[in-house]
């Protein structure tokens, strides 16, 4: 009788390598899937390691382009910052990984999908809800959550079964990285009073070692999509990776955040998001120039809802297409160039321009070139303040009766 197949989200690390053997011992044929969403992973190494530790098949997918265009871009256009700080680095990649796992499960006839999340984090929710939304007939397995071993027990299991142990296993931090940034937790970072050691950072320079001369760059957008740096066009994924390097060397994008996790606990996280934070700031400035007041004031309602939806693992909910449709419509005229100075940990906006600019200098100026009709203000103020005036007249004439 043929074994059931399970598709495992495989990173090449200790947890998922042990999971291959553990799932095999449970009677499954394991199909490993490794994705590159911009962390610089050696896909061929990941593929071969999965086979080495017992997978019957191993798939590797370069998903940077799809990740940037279909997941990161809406988050950028929504200025998605969970609790006004976290640009959803890990949360954004989970629905894409889930999508690829389900696609390969359906292609190979697998009956289950597995992930390497613990029972304490948000990612288990994001993966399982996404997978259920995409194919409710698939079983979802969580071996790391089920076995609940300590790190030492896991290492002993790996040694006993000749599973290669990663050379960076003594790294005290739990790290997740993709092109939108890098997240870091555990170790000394679990103490919210502790200063994050420099060893916790990889994408950004400490302020003491940043250049004493700023980089001044121009970011070009077309309908809300970043398309060029200093006039040089890039595909979106490569533009973000390039900006990570430029802004990162100036120490831009370090975030230290005690956040409210979906599972009900608070967690101290350290993030590095040089490209993300620079792009979000520049995009917002271009919107300030091009969006009419009503749209600009309403859009944050949609932004907050999409941010929560992503963080809470509901990317594939029925609400998401409606939110993205609003975002797409809102970006029709968000075309132009923003000039940014990168210096000593800051991305400073120095200028913005657009053919769709709603800023009229002749109306805004206080010079003799002023074309604003000052006399119109009298009638406007009278009508604008009329409800307030009437209310005041009534309340002053009649005192409220308290029953």
UniProtKB/Swiss-Prot annotation:
Taxonomic placement: Bacteria, Bacillati, Bacillota, Bacilli, Bacillales
Protein known as: Argininosuccinate synthase
EC number: 6.3.4.5
Listed GO biological process terms: argininosuccinate metabolic process; L-arginine biosynthetic process; urea cycle
PROSITE patterns hit by this protein: ARGININOSUCCIN_SYN_1, ARGININOSUCCIN_SYN_2
Subcellular location: Cytoplasm
Gene Ontology molecular function: any one: ATP binding
Highest taxon of source: Bacteria
Binding residues for ATP: 9-17, 116
HAMAP family in UniProt: Arg_succ_synth_type1
Enzyme class of the recorded protein, top EC level: ligase
Positions that bind L-aspartate: 118, 122-123
